[in-house]
Amino acid sequence: MLVALAAIGVTVLLFLIKALGSGAKKAPVTLLDPNAKYPLPLIEKQEISHDTKKFRFGLPSAEHVLGLPVGQHIYLSAKVNGSLVVRAYTPVSSDEVKGHVDLVVKVYYKNVNPKFPDGGKMSQHLDSLKIGETIDFRGPNGLLVYKGKGKFAIRPDKKAEPKIKVAKHVGMLAGGTGITPMLQLIRQITQDPNDNTKCYLIFANQTEDDILLRYELETVAKSHPEQFKLWYTLDRPPQGWKYGSGFVTADMIKEHLPPPSEDVLVLMCGPPPMIQFACQDNLTKLGYPEAGRFAY
């Protein structure tokens, strides 16, 4: 009898230990206050292409996560030549990653583009950072949050309450570095086995070498062919290029994005002229309602 009771006691004890252990502590969050600045150190710099680099910044501890909801972005701020420079970025690392955050940034160097002889102030500042030097992060920021399973909370402006939009199909129009919020969302959707939302991306660039995060995008497209459709268009395509060429057109949208519907949301991120003339004007022409569009 005593042996039986002891066995039961041990079983109960093991169950309690397991139950307590399974309720793992939530990882501490770095971005606790969207109005505060958090100086984070550069811990790694990796060259991705001739003008693009990945910058890895350390979080306060190896257990910390950044704390950035899907759909949101951060602001980096720094004094450059005596002036405050602030720029928005979307990390390419998942928010579940502990200890660091990764940004992929296209560096706009001086005297390369005659229209912008000074180049990009923030991107060149990032490129000049030495390992261990810090830059200020602020966030989360943004008007859109993805809640999962096709549910988006979208605010018309910063002071407005969010409106819920449920989409079975998400069209995406991205140009250049505007790909980062799209990849963030694509990864979140395809990594959740309970999320059946389908994504359709048209990604516009000048040349094939300018395609950011191509490997990551094509990896997802290959592993989730029914859930993620990928199409590129280039201003200056190479010979034998099998995707699109030129600006995003109404015909291109018609062919590669889902048609207008109540359960369709179209997201846009890229240079302002592209958003206005290649995206918004063509979406209007094709009958996509304004309530079913969002520009980052």
From Swiss-Prot:
One of its GO terms (biological process) is sterol biosynthetic process. Keywords: FAD, Flavoprotein, Lipid biosynthesis, Lipid metabolism, Membrane, NAD, Oxidoreductase, Steroid biosynthesis, Steroid metabolism, Sterol biosynthesis, Sterol metabolism, Transmembrane, Transmembrane helix. It catalyses: 2 Fe(III)-[cytochrome b5] + NADH = 2 Fe(II)-[cytochrome b5] + NAD(+) + H(+). Disulfide bonds: none annotated. The keyword Membrane applies. Residues 35-147 form the FAD-binding FR-type domain. It holds the Pfam family NAD_binding_1. FAD binds at residues 127-142, 166-201. It is a single-pass membrane protein. The chain crosses the membrane at residues 2-24. Its cofactor is FAD. GO terms for cellular component: membrane; mitochondrion. Belongs to the flavoprotein pyridine nucleotide cytochrome reductase family. GO terms for molecular function: cytochrome-b5 reductase activity, acting on NAD(P)H; FAD binding. This is NADH-cytochrome b5 reductase 2. It is found in: Membrane. InterPro entries: CBR-like, Cbr1-like_FAD-bd_dom, FAD-bd_FR_type, Flavoprot_Pyr_Nucl_cyt_Rdtase, FNR_nucleotide-bd, OxRdtase_FAD/NAD-bd, Riboflavin_synthase-like_b-brl.
